[in-house]
Amino acid sequence: FSTATDLAQLFQMLLNGGRYNGQQIFRPATVATFTNKSRFNYRALGFDRLKGGWPNVVKAGASEETFGHTGFSGTCVWADPENELVFVLLTNRIHPNPKNNRLKRFNTRGRAHLQVYRSLLRPEA
C-alpha cells in the first residue's frame, strides 16, 4: 500500500525514462523493458497495456502507449506517455468486504478516466 503522491512520483519517473528530481533511478532501457508491450499478450513485464481490453481507458482517449495497473483492493494507476499524463485513483474496493463490486457496477474507474481526459486533454468533449 502507498499514497497517491508516491504512486504519481513513481509513474512520473517511468514517464521520464527512469529519471526523477534530477536523479536517474532506472536506466531508460530498464523502463522500456517493463513498459513495452509483450509479443505474447497484452501485458508488459511490469504493467498492463491497453491492448488487453481496458475499454474505459481507451474510450477516455488514452494513447496506445499507456501502461498501468489495477489492483484487487481498488488501486488504479496509469501513465500515458503520448499525452504526458499520470492518473492515480486509490479506493478501498474491499470495504466492507472483498465481495464488494460497486467499483465495477458503477464503472468508477472508467468514469474517472473519462473525466480526467475530458477536462485536461479534450475540454470540448
Residue spans for each PLM region:
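Catalytic loop of the DD-peptidase/beta-lactamase superfamily, centered on the K-T-G motif
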Residues: 1-125
